[in-house]
């Protein structure tokens, strides 16, 4: 029994050790693959720089939509071995170098996101909280990030409907990162 605890006991994507809670290596690898896929898509110019930054930040912070929390870090917010978060921050920086991109200043960090989620979620402006976006901010995200131009920016119902549909597609991508962890 003690040998198992020293080596870690896997459960629901976590690894439980004697004094720490970590993440199963397969869960980390899946997130790293997902992040690297964003870099590949950007390198092939399949996605715009704006979509790339938005999706990368969503992968890092997760988001709140319709009062529900989505994303890898929200799921793994009970971890106590923070070394994985420092590694993931390093990994993102490494990918910028490897793919020959300059790192924009507005790229989020895993370690800060974790602390915002665990200690400041109700007041955080760092975590993407779609529920707090104004009508104007939603319209700007649709037009500036997603390049959607053919909608009435003055119609709150249209903007809200398009924004929710767009965000739910992004949420599906986030949820894929935490599926099949057993």
PLM features: residue spans?
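Short proline/glycine- and acidic-rich turn/helix-capping motifs at secondary-structure junctions
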Residues: 1-8, 113
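Active-site and adjacent loop segments of nucleotide-processing enzymes
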Residues: 10-182
């Amino acid at each position: 029994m003690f040998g198992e605890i020293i080596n870690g006991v896997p459960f629901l994507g976590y690894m439980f050790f004697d004094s720490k809670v970590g993440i199963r290596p397969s869960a980390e690898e899946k997130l790293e693959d997902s992040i690297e896929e964003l870099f590949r898509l950007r390198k092939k110019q399949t996605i715009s720089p704006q979509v790339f930054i938005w999706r990368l930040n969503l992968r890092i912070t997760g988001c709140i939509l319709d009062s529900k929390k989505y994303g890898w870090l929200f799921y793994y917010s009970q971890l106590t071995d923070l070394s994985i978060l420092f590694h993931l921050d390093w990994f993102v920086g490494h990918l910028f170098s490897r793919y020959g991109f300059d790192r924009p200043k507005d790229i989020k960090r895993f370690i800060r996101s974790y602390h915002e989620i665990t200690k400041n979620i109700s007041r955080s402006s760092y975590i993407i909280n779609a529920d707090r976006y104004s009508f104007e901010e939603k319209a700007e995200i649709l037009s500036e990030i997603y390049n959607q131009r053919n909608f009435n920016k003055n119609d709150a119902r249209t903007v809200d409907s398009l924004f929710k549909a767009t965000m739910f597609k992004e949420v599906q991508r986030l949820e894929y990162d935490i599926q099949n962890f057993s």
